[in-house]
């Protein structure tokens, strides 16, 4: 899913919870949501890896399944 810059409406480059607009240079925080219940996910970082955990009963969520939205 492509997210667009709220300032200039260009497509954002996404990287692990952050987004950057190539056009205007804006840096934007993103929020990770569970694809099943759409609740915020807990971000677990260890040894260079980033994992996502749903505290509402859906457990560990693959990075490929996480829904990112602008925070």
Swiss-Prot record:
Protein's UniProt name: Uncharacterized protein YfgJ
Q: Which domain of life is it from?
A: Bacteria
What intrachain disulfides are recorded?
A: none
Q: Which SUPFAM superfamilies has this protein been placed in?
A: YfgJ-like (SSF161187)
Q: Which organism is it from?
A: Escherichia coli (strain K12)
Pfam families in the cross-refs:
Zn_ribbon_6
Do you know which InterPro entries this protein is assigned to?
A: DUF1407/YfgJ-like_sf (IPR029037), YfgJ-like (IPR010807)
From the UniProt record, report the name of the gene that encodes this protein.
yfgJ
- List where the protein spans the membrane: none
Q: Which GO terms describe its biological process?
A: bacterial-type flagellum-dependent swarming motility
